[in-house]
Amino acid sequence: MPKKLFYRCISYRMNKKNILVISIFLFICAFCFSQKIHPSIEPVFLPEDVLVNANRAGWSLSADEVFRLALLCSECPLDSEAGEKCLLIFEKIKAEVSSDDFMQLELEERGRAVLKLLYRDYLTTYDFHQTRTDVALLTGVYNCVSSGVLYMAAAKAAGLEVRGQKTTEHAFCTVYLPNTSGGKTNQLKKIDVETTNPYGFNPGTRETIENEDKIQSYYVVPKKYYANRQEVSDRIFAGLIAGNLCSYYIEQNNYEKAIPLGAARYEFVLQEKSKAANEARRDLDVLASNYVNTDIQDAKLFSGYVEWFTGFIDRWGMTDYLQKNMDTALYNLLVLCLQQKDFPLAEASFNKFKPYITQKQAATSQEILADIFFDSGLEGLPAEEQIELINQTLSQPQNQDEAFQKRAQHYLENAWLMILNNCMNIRDYETGFQKSEEALQYLPKSSKIKKIQKAFYDNCIAIIHNNFAEQANAQRFDQARQVLEAGMQVFPDDKTLKNDLNLLNRMTAN
């Protein structure tokens, strides 16, 4: 409701106390809406929402656990209308695959029958992007992940040992059966199950599918998509649903949904030591890092993003990937502060976030802090006042950091060069030389000041020599001697002036 309308409706009958309360309320509301609300860093669901025994840390989940995890990874709450409907459907699937008709089948035939059942009653249309299990069940539209996880849950309910397989581009299942053809004792027979099409049990074999006319479309996976396969835990396999959704949300710039979902996916495999679990952690780090690298042009607003990022690090722990992005985030924040000449924010941010950055980035940050401080503090001041302010700053205990001192020397050098260049422009070479001597007391290693000092020196000597020559050529030897003596008081060791004096002595000796 607009504020004016709100006040007009109630102010005529309010006492002062009520007006104060409403004013405070409106102020709080305005303040809240002016703040950026960042994504939650907490998982959108937890293992105890799925596991019958939350202490179980093994790879294998039960059929119900796989299915419940698949629904939650699909962003389908178990108590939602869709969730309850899917749970009822799965109870129906479990009842059929565990019926006497199914259980009397040989294990291999039972695995094939589970896939046929899913295509007979539920899966109808392949869609590369449709990764949600609830949507697959309720609409028949599926992809490799949603159909693969659904098959895993149903096959487990049928008493089969089934494991998930993932590649860079694909996901499918493998059924493990006792080996009845001889060979090593306890060796299992592996049969891949390509769940993207009804002929996918033991790919390469051909068979008749009941109700084939109801299947609108299915997918034949290119052979190259099977390269570099990894066998993964049930948790990882069901979590592929969440991983796909997070990728989609990245494209939509929707980190409010992506980060809590990615956190839930990782929380489920937190204790697992595997390449796939490491990939889940890396994916979560990418989500947070992408968010903190959002293109924000306001330093104060962006500082909130960096603070959020440190909260994420506190919650999930530092990794090499997060460290790199933390260093970058603070660097970007300080650059924004430099552009906006906001030294107080830069200094406060550096002090707050310093525990999260590397020593190398801390040194770089100190240089940027110096740039911000001097760019904002020296602007518009005469060079002499700049030098005074810089020297005062350099003497303060809190500014003894090597990187800060290094940048301060740069600004001090520039201030002195302003003075010296002015002397050069007005051809006041002697004053310029004297000023350069003073400057070198502060900046003894400055090649720029040494270079301009030499120019002053050479010009001074040239002027003295030319004045001497003019007087000597006119036979005004006393004036010529005065010129040399005055010059040698300033430059007593100059060879040119000494040679001129020797020449004058010879000229006047006769």
Describe every region a protein language model picked out.
Residues 63-135, 185:
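Secondary-structure boundary elements
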Residues 146-217, 281:
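Hydrophobic/aromatic-rich core segments of domains that either
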Residues 224, 232-251, 274-296, 322-336, ...:
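Amphipathic alpha-helical repeat scaffolds of TPR domains
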Residues 270-271, 317, 324, 358, ...:
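Short coil turns that delineate tetratricopeptide repeat
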